[in-house]
């Protein structure tokens, strides 16, 4: 029986370094005093070895029921080891945006002190993989950008940078970039710019403080 008021959380230990970091994180959560009832969910290469499926029906049922999980990295499923469990998980939960808040902490003397950037990536459709599927690709892009710009406003952000590869895939990435520009007009309170993804990556390594929000795919 679950403890009254406890959070019920699925625990996916993952593959590779996953179990080490996942169990360390789980111990930190427990030490914080948070009331959590953990449910161990079979997934990854251990599950594949037992059942032939890295993310099977039992894992899907647990995630659908609990709706909250601590998940470590899972192997991609390449090399004939079944379907990528990360993609299966995204499809199961309807995930279309990954949100990562990257922030530095003071007192370390780091050249990246003062970094506070919100990074959001479109997860469900890659602009490059959607080549030749213009109508199908545009709707997920609009959904992603509306969410991302709205999240930026809610977080009190002021400037959005869209990272793209239009120089190497003009027709496909150009459509994606146009969807971003259209979304920016629906959020006039945000400053908008676009940059090549390679340049954004270089600036993130050299001077991440210049960024506020980065959107990518």
Label the model's feature ranges.
Residues 15-18, 67, 120, 148, ...:
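Buried hydrophobic positions in well-ordered alpha/beta secondary-structure cores of metabolic enzymes
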Residues 4-8, 34, 64-68, 94-95, ...:
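Short coil/turn connectors at secondary-structure junctions
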Residues 48-132:
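N-terminal glycine-rich phosphate/adenylate-binding segment common to multiple enzyme folds
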Residues 35-58, 204:
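N-terminal beta-loop-helix "entrance" segment that forms/cooperates
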Residues 62-78, 190-217:
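Glycine-rich phosphate-binding loop
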Residues 47, 77-78, 167-172, 202:
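Short, small-residue-enriched loops and turns at beta-alpha junctions
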Residues 9-31, 132-198:
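Glycine-rich phosphate/diphosphate-binding loop of Rossmann-like nucleotide-binding domains
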Residues 3-14, 39-44:
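Generic N-terminal amphipathic, Lys/Arg-enriched alpha-helix
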